[in-house]
């Protein structure tokens, strides 16, 4: 699997979600029908900061061999994040009618869960670089 592509795409998605959660938390809460009060806004902003941190981690590790002995923590952290959120979103989808964005999110997180699971539980393959 091309881990560089996986890392770049996941970094872009997490950065977009993190920026949205950091700068428009009230609007996000309103879209999902939640109260837009101080504590809820703060929790969405903190979550946005976490997403931005993961995005930076993935962006900075994009050129490394992910899944090997040194890249395993990055793969495991991503796998854990995407798996837990995928199951939480799947549970919400199964519970009843949800906005389409929740279904799209569950699908997207499920795909990242599978991708990082593949990277984590299969041996890494280094890509031969052309000689300079």
Placement of each model-derived feature along the sequence:
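Core segments of alpha-helical transmembrane spans in multipass integral membrane proteins
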Residues: 16-20, 40-63, 76-87
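Short, Lys/Arg-enriched, Gly/Pro-containing loop segments at transmembrane-helix junctions
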Residues: 30, 68, 125-132
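Membrane-helix boundary connector in multi-pass membrane proteins
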Residues: 87-104, 120-122
């Amino acid at each position: 699997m091309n881990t560089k592509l996986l890392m770049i795409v996941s970094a872009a998605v997490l950065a977009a979600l993190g920026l949205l959660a950091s700068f428009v938390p009230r609007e996000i809460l309103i879209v999902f029908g939640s109260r837009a009060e101080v504590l809820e806004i703060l929790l969405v902003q903190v979550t946005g900061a976490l997403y931005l941190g993961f995005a930076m981690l993935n962006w900075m590790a994009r050129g490394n061999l992910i899944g090997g002995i040194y890249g395993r923590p990055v793969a495991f952290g991503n796998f854990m994040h995407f798996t837990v959120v995928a199951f939480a979103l799947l549970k919400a989808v199964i519970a009843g009618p949800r906005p389409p964005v929740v279904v799209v999110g569950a699908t997207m997180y499920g795909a990242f869960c599978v991708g990082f699971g593949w990277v984590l539980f299969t041996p890494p393959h280094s890509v031969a670089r052309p000689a300079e």
